[in-house]
């Protein structure tokens, strides 16, 4: 590589070292474990009706981690999947809360060839579709802001978020809370999206912090 003031050198790592470029995410995994995020989700969100496939906790936590990692779309979940070090950490977290028998079964599952550490983009798209109510779309009026009524799964997610806030309040009680709200433009390439006042296609979710 071209040299400047400092003599930089680099070389490719030839062996499988298990390093990660997402070193900040394990801190959030630890926080989620301490606050019982998985328990909050499991108590209220019931999209998954069988024991097969990814659980509600795994799907939602993967989406949370994708957001924290700066993903722009569901397809960016591939970034997490390709990071071997992160996948090893996530696998460790998955087995921590289980019994020995469950842990051994999970470890055998993780050792299977081509096993994913996070749901595939198609699996996440199918999961997210459960939170969408097509009947509500019929009441949408062109050119007007519209907030669809939440279906049972969105209501469950709201309850899980309520419990999560309660866990934080329990550990750090506050008498007052300031809610900062703002409508933010999120650029999208979806063909059904409308153009924003900035001149590009976007959705405008109403965020509250």
What do these predicted regions represent?
Residues 1-209:
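Dynamic "connector" segments at or just before major functional cores
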């Amino acid at each position: 590589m071209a040299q400047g003031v400092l003599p930089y050198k680099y070389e490719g790592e030839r062996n499988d070292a298990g390093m990660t470029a997402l070193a900040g995410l394990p801190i959030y995994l630890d926080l989620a474990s301490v606050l019982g995020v998985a328990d909050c989700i499991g108590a209220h969100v019931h999209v998954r009706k069988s024991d097969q496939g990814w659980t509600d906790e795994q799907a939602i936590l993967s989406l949370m981690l994708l957001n924290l990692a700066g993903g722009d779309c569901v397809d960016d979940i591939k970034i997490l999947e390709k990071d071997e070090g992160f996948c090893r950490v996530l696998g460790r977290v998955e087995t921590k809360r289980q019994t020995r028998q469950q842990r051994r079964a999970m470890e055998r599952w993780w050792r299977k060839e081509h096993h994913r550490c996070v749901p595939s983009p198609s699996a996440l798209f199918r999961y997210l579709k459960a939170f969408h109510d097509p009947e509500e779309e019929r009441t949408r009026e062109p050119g007007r802001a519209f907030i669809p009524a939440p279906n049972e799964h969105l209501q469950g997610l709201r309850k899980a978020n309520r419990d999560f806030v309660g866990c934080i309040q329990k550990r750090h009680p506050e008498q007052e809370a300031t809610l900062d709200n703002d409508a933010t433009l999120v650029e999208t390439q979806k063909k059904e999206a409308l153009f924003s006042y900035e001149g590009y296609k976007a959705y405008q979710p109403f965020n509250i912090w």
